[in-house]
Amino acid sequence: ELEKEFQKQKYLSTPDRLDLAQSLGLTQLQVKTWYQNRRMKWKKMVLKGGQEAPTKPKGRPKKNSIPTSEEIEAEEKLNSQVQSQELREPSQGLEGLCDTQEPKARVVPVEVAESPGQAQELPVTSPEPPPSS
């Protein structure tokens, strides 16, 4: 029954999902999950040259419907442009902090003569790596 409905309609509205779940004795979550899994399987088949072509969802349109791949790509492109702009132009508030902050001290284990075999951690402020022994 789920497979028949899927062939007719790739996306279910909430009322359709509720009706189908009740008619099959399943929960809405079970039907929703089955449809999500089945759509993924269907999309893989389509991409590998299956016989069906992707179609737009039928039934009642929703205000917050699932975006198309074109909408997703456009949004990702917009987000990447915004991120690259932020990298080139850091916000005003952070610039002042960078100039005045001192480098953070690194904690490096140092051997101490009074306690052989035990390392004592001391802060080191120089940017050079610790000498290798």
Swiss-Prot record:
Expressed in keratinizing epithelia such as wool follicle, tongue and esophagus. Expressed at low level in thymus. Not detected in spleen, skeletal muscle, brain, heart kidney, liver and lung. SUPFAM superfamilies: Homeodomain-like (SSF46689). It is found in: Nucleus. It holds the Pfam family Homeodomain. InterPro entries: HD, HD_metazoa, Homeobox_CS, Homeobox_TF, Homeodomain-like_sf, HTH_motif. It comes from the Eukaryota. GO terms for molecular function: DNA binding; DNA-binding transcription factor activity, RNA polymerase II-specific. One of its GO terms (cellular component) is nucleus. Residues 1-46 bind DNA. Keywords: DNA-binding, Homeobox, Nucleus, Transcription, Transcription regulation. Its main location: nucleus. Residues 45-133 are annotated as: Disordered. Transcription factor. Binds optimally to the DNA consensus sequence 5'-YYTAATGRTTTTY-3'. May control the expression of neural adhesion molecules such as L1 or Ng-CAM during embryonic development of both the central and peripherical nervous system. May be involved in controlling adhesive processes in keratinizing epithelia. Belongs to the BAR homeobox family. This is Homeobox protein BarH-like 2. It comes from Ovis aries. The gene is BARX2.
